[in-house]
Amino acid sequence: MPSSNNKDNFLDKAFTVIAEGIVKMMPIAAKEKQAYIYYREGFAAQNNGDYSEALENYEESLKLEENPVDRGETLKNMAIIYMSNGDEDRALETYVKALDQNPKQPSCLKNMGLIYEKRGRSAQQRGLQDESDIWFDKAADVWTKAVRLYPGGYLDIENWLKTTGRSKIDVYL
């Protein structure tokens, strides 16, 4: 019986073949097709944990991609990598760029809030209550926006907003 890993590998390869066929048939310019290919390669590398290769492919995709929604998605994935690598400042900058391209990405706002909330907890542990409140307020601001974009999708965040008294909205749905 094949292992789960073999099944996943087969599915990845099958998806890649199908996606390549679709891209070839799509009635779009060669530049846009190449941008998508770089994006897809970056996404595959990211899923395999090869973050440097993923970032290289995402950078190439951004050079070619003109669609703001697609650019926003690429930037969001880059920010996730920066966040995973512990480069929170760069992640925040990149999330802002992603939102500039496509403001309807609640996951960007959610992840920005995670960074702010983490910084708030850190300041709180060091006894810096004023600084902690600033970070928690920033988290509340972006999380409120995320909840408005994706009602019911972030129940843990809705609960945090309510229990900390930072909820700016009465009804989330």
UniProtKB/Swiss-Prot annotation:
Pfam families: TPR_12. InterPro entries: PSI_Ycf3_assembly (IPR022818), TPR-like_helical_dom_sf (IPR011990), TPR_rpt (IPR019734), Ycf3/AcsC/BcsC/TPR_MFPF (IPR051685). GO terms for cellular component: plasma membrane-derived thylakoid membrane. SMART domains: TPR. Keywords: Membrane, Photosynthesis, Repeat, Thylakoid, TPR repeat. NCBIfam families: PRK02603.1. Essential for the assembly of the photosystem I (PSI) complex. May act as a chaperone-like factor to guide the assembly of the PSI subunits. PANTHER family: CELLULOSE SYNTHASE OPERON PROTEIN C (PTHR44943), TPR REPEAT-CONTAINING PROTEIN MJ0263 (PTHR44943:SF8). Belongs to the Ycf3 family. This is Photosystem I assembly protein Ycf3. It comes from Prochlorococcus marinus (strain MIT 9211). The lineage of its organism: Bacteria, Bacillati, Cyanobacteriota, Cyanophyceae, Synechococcales. The gene is ycf3.
